[in-house]
Each structure stands twice: as C-alpha cells, then as structure tokens.
Amino acid sequence: MNILINKRIFLLVTLVGIQLNVTAKQNSSNSNREELLPIIVNTNDDSNKLPGRSVLKQKNIEQXQADNAANLINILPGVNMAGGFRPGGQTLNINGMGDAEDVRVQLDGATKSFEKYQQGSIFIEPELLRRVTVDKGNYSPQYGNGGFAGTVKFETKDARDFLQENQKIGGFLKYGNNSNNNQKTYSTALVLQNEQKNIDLLLFGSVRNAGDYKRPDNSKILFSKNNQKTGLIKLNWQISPEHLLTLSSVYGIHKGWEPFAAKRDILPKPSLSDIMRYGTDIAWKRKLVYRDQKDENYTLKYNYLPENNPWINLSTQFSYSKTTQNDMRPKEASSGLVGSLGNQSWITYSDLTFDINNTSTFNIKTTVHELLFGLQWLKNTRNTLMYDKSKVRKADYNYGYFQPYYMPSGRQYTQAFYLQDQIKWKNIIFSTGVRYDHINNIGQKNLALKYNDISAGHDYSQKNYNGWSYYLGLNYDVNHYLSLFTNFSKTWRAPVIDEQYETQFKQSSVPATSLNLEKEMINQTRVGGIITLNHLFQENDAFQFRTTYFYNRGKNEIFKTRGVNCVGNAADTNNKVCPKIIENYRNLPGYVIQGAELEAYYQSTYLFGEITYSYVKGKRDTSPRNPWGKTSTWIAEIPPRKATTALGFNVPKYYLTVGWRAEFVRRQDRSPLSGDPKASSWSLPASRGYSLHNLFLSWSPAKIKGMNVKITVDNLFNRAYNPYLGELASGTGRNIKFSLSQKF
C-alpha cells in the first residue's frame, strides 16, 4: 500500500494516465462530462426516504473539499463535529451523544473503534469516499452492543466511478489547494476492467500536505500541520450473475509534531527560561509529541443472489481494521508525565468482524415478508504501553514500562444472532426484530505492580454480559406523496475495556477496577413523516419535506466515579465515610435526550435548495458526580440548535453549478453547573451563537472531456467562532479551496 502513495508512483501513474487518455477516448462512445447534481441530499433516491437517514453522495463529498471526515458530515442535521481542527482531533456527535462507543463508525463495512485519551476517533481520508450514510439512532437488529447515537457508514470509491461504458482502462488525476493553511492535495488512480466486464480493479492514492491553520484573526493554530498519505485497492469480481466478491484495502499514515491532546486548541507557550536553556525549537517540542500514526482497513465481501430463488440472498463479510499511534517526546522533555502517556507510548486498537446473513422473500396470504437472519462474531483488542522515564528505577512501576492506568489493555468478544421480519400489507410496512448478544470482557494485568494489586481492587478477570434487544417499526404510505413512520427499540451495551478495567493507585479514593458494572440500557422512540412531491413547479423537479421527533430514555448510564463516592455521603459532606475500595466507574440512574429535526429539499434542472433545523435537549436524573442527589442536570454534550440552508443553480448547457450554503448555530449555555455547581469537570464552556457562509462552484469544460474544476469558499466573511463541542477551540478563518481533476 505504501507504493500507492509514494510521490514517484504518483508521477508514474500521471504519465501512464496521459497515455491512457487516447485509449479511453477510442473505447468510449459516450461523453466523459460530469452530470452535475445539486449539492444536496438527492430526494429521488429511495434510500434517502428511510426515517432518520441522511446521505452524502460523491458529488456532495467532492464539492465540500473537506480536510477530514468529521467536518465533511458536519453539515447534516443532528450531526456535529466535536474537537478541534488539528489532524486526528475530531470526534462525532449525533443528537447529543458523542462518546466513541455511542457512534458506530464503519469503513466499507469494517468497524472502526478508537478511544485514545484526548484524541479524535476518526481518521478516514475524504478523498477516498464515494458515499456516506448516517443512520441516526439504533433501530436495526444488525447492530448491537452500543451505537446508541447511530451508525456512520463510509464507502470508498469504486472502479465504476471512473470508467465509461465499454472502457477497459482508465486513469484519474487531481490537484487541490487550500488558501488558509497552504494545503496541497494530490490524488491519482489507475482503473482496470477485463473484456467480460466482470472484474474491475481500482488503485487509488492521495497525498495531503498542509501548514498550520489560521484563525479568523490571522493567528496560527500552532502545530496543526498535516502530512498524510493514503492508498486504496479495491477489486470487484462478478464470478457469475449470482456470485459477487469484493475486496477493499485502505492504508493511511500520518506523522508530525503535535500536542498530545489533539482535540484541544490553545497550547501554552514555553517560558523564557526554557527558551534560553533549550532554544526556541526544543522549548516548543518539549510540549509536543512526535506522532507516528497508521490506519489500516481490510474487507472481504461475498454475495450470493440466485436469479429464481427468493429464499436466498446471502451476504458474508470478513473485515479487519487497526489504528496505531506511537508517540515520542524529545529527550529534553520533562519526566513525571504519567497522566499524558509518559515520554513514549505505543497504542493499538483493532477490530476483527465476521458477519453472515440471509434475506428470504415470501408471501403469506396477502402479505409480503422479507425475513432477515444473521450471525455475527466480533473481537475488539486494545494494546497499550507507555514509558515514563521518571519511573525507570522503580520496580513497582516495572522500571518505567507499563500500561496507562486510565487506558488498560484488554479484549472484548461479541457473539450475536439477529432476526428481523419486514411485513408489507397494502400500503403498510411493519417490521419486528430481535437480537441476542453475548459479550466477554477480558482485561490484561498491568505490568506495573502499582496498578496490579488485588488488595486495592485491581481485578482484571473476565466479565460476561448477555441479553436481548427488541425492535419495532411501522411505515404507512397515506398516499403517493405522504408517508408516516414510527420506530421503537430497546437495546443495551456492555462496558468497554476502559470502563471495566481502569484503575488508580491503592491510596487514591477510587482505586479499583469496575467488575460490578451493570449493562447500560436505552429505549428509543421516533415518529415523523415524509412528504415527497415530484413535478411540483416544472417537469422533473422534486421537493421533499421530512420531520422527525425522537425520545431516548437511558438507564444505568456507565460513568466515572468522581465526586460523591457512596450513598453514605449522599449529602456530599465527606467521602471518608465511604469504603476504602471504590470502583472507577459506576451506573448512574438515567437520562432523557429528546429533540426534533425539520428538513426541506428542492431540486430541479436549474435550481436547488435546502433548509434544515435540528434541536436537541438532554438531562440526567441526577448530577453526574452524585447519583444519590435529587437535582437533575443538563447533559454537557448536547449541541446547540443548528439550522442550515443552501441555494444554488445549475447551467446544464455549460456543466456549471454555483451555490451558497450557510450554517446558523445558537448559543449554548445549558450546563451541569446550573444543577450542581461542583460539576465543573463534566461541563463545557458556554458558547456564543454564530453564522457561517460558504460559496461553491463546479464546472466541467465541454471541450475538455473528463475535466472538472471546483471552488469552495468556507467562512466567506472570515467570522470568528468557537464551536461549543470543540470546548471553545477556535474555528478557522476564510479558506478558499480549489481543485482541478481529470479523468482519462
């Protein structure tokens, strides 16, 4: 995979692609011009009419020219990017839930999980993507053990995205430039297809080099440079009309000096004495780590669909993903950095997944059934190790090499089966489903005896969880343009490895691992309607209006034990009355998150537009630091209200699309502090409201087949803003993005 993203290979494929241009023209009788669709969710796609689903297609993705995957989908209602703008500093928040275990992320069907302390959780290169699907909430039995907020499915490009009819070999070149951080992006592809058109291969590489971002006041977000290389190999083999095999492989690397906490913004400057002692360069680097990150993803899919057998539609998938971050501080760095992964650290998260399912279609009297049955096996592994040079002579710290007490190593195994019957009768679709999960958590003993002391409650033994989840859905097509829907699910999740096996030293107030945790459970309900009107004002136009209300009731929330440690201190006076051994995590009583979304989309041959509005509010039954208290508190991770709007026009004759997009965000001042003044550790700073305006243009010159020019201007008015979920990290200033691409 490194070959793909080497610059010399980029130049080689460039030369090959130029030669292929002549061949491609000879092999194709159709124009290679792009048909520019409106930069909105396509209302004509039936998959977009599913409740709670938002879709970004390839044109949407390419026009945004986003630097990271989280920022790409930030435009969707109910979806927000959390964190800052440094590389690898972004997480996702869907309808007020933002923990990594709440938002399920998949790349080509492979689960991606990364929960490193103070880091982002998503490292997918947008240049690779052809489609992003966001399913909000957990209403499908195909997904279990978490993912309460929803599932984000990223799909990589395919050979068919580049090939014309009857084309056997093709190429692609792209150059991009961003003004804010002087970013240069280079992408190239080589595409092959056999004579029978049943085998195609895509080789795709992308290089992204950027300097520091600038804030609206023109100051730099120091150490936000990006040096990233990514490669993709994707093979489709239609073995026969009934058998399809797909293999995809993604590999990305990122290296550079950056703050340990990638999600944060402001970096304290080195003192004058440090500069005098070490020099400016080393004085700054003493506050940084040199990060070597590798992200890889492999998926093998097999589909069997007999032509005349409605009982069989078999799908099998085997996937493996791994993310590795190795951080090293300079030798001049101080010691005693246990709380920030020491002087050097080696962190790896991996996911191994196997899924097999079959869908049978049959009739019972006047009803049509689609019966889905599947089996799943998943393995999540977390390997962590750090080196703290201040502990090099201490045997109880294994002479400096041990696992961070707040990031234990361990494995989680999931065995599951699921069943769903979707019943269609006249204009009503009723679905019911069940899922059973059996979870095995297995901790790994810490190498440091300081965190491996059974008398302090450091117990890394296996813990098992199991249970059923239930799903109901109803969709009623009132007529050809109005659909009403409602969904309900009752699901649960087991603790992740960090929650189960985090420790502290014996003398601390909460030293123990958390083997007494119960399952966290949630009941989710949503209701709404979809109106779809075609040929409303003119031929071939479309209008869609969607409204959704959701209500989530969570119980036994898994949360850190801080503040009031036991029921004996419910009055919050003195924790000395509590037992000596307290677990690091506990179950809080519960919470309610509810909200609404309104969406309107219009598109026609010449005009398109959209308006969306999302509102979420959430409260815990008690304070996060006192589960025995009587005062409810706001949930800190609830995003402020957000509205987006877009308006643009197409000029089909000239293959031109021009548009404007705006985002309006309300202030957020609801804080746990209003219910518990001592809950500052679980609060985010209040934020002011703001509005951002963007412009975009896409043009495919008619005389140069396959060429496309895109221009996007982000933050047109250079407005200063601080996103609430970024903990008031500054937004970036005006950014003019330009790209030029050529298909051969």
Curated annotation (Swiss-Prot):
Xref: CDD domains: ligand_gated_channel
Keyword Cell inner membrane: no
Signal peptide range: 1-24
A GO biological process held by the record: siderophore transmembrane transport
A single GO cellular-component term on record: cell outer membrane
TBDR beta-barrel domain span: 168-744
Top-level taxon of origin: Bacteria
Subcellular location: Cell outer membrane
Matching InterPro entries: Plug_dom, Plug_dom_sf, TonB-dep_rcpt-like, TonB-dep_rcpt_b-brl, TonB_haem/Hb_rcpt, TonB_Hb/transfer/lactofer_rcpt, TonB_rcpt_b-brl_sf, TonB_rcpt_CS
SUPFAM superfamilies: Porins (SSF56935)
Annotated GO MF terms: heme transmembrane transporter activity; siderophore uptake transmembrane transporter activity
PROSITE patterns: TONB_DEPENDENT_REC_2 (PS01156), TONB_DEPENDENT_REC_3 (PS52016)
Membrane topology value: Multi-pass membrane protein
Keywords: Cell outer membrane, Membrane, Receptor, Signal, TonB box, Transmembrane, Transmembrane beta strand, Transport
Any Pfam family the entry gives: TonB_dep_Rec_b-barrel
Gene3D superfamilies: TonB-dependent receptor, beta-barrel domain (2.40.170.20), TonB-dependent receptor, plug domain (2.170.130.10)
Domain TBDR plug per the UniProt entry, residue ranges: 45-157
The protein's role, per its UniProt record: Heme receptor.
Similarity comment text for this entry: Belongs to the TonB-dependent receptor family.
Protein name stated in the entry: TonB-dependent heme receptor A
Organism: Haemophilus influenzae (strain ATCC 51907 / DSM 11121 / KW20 / Rd)
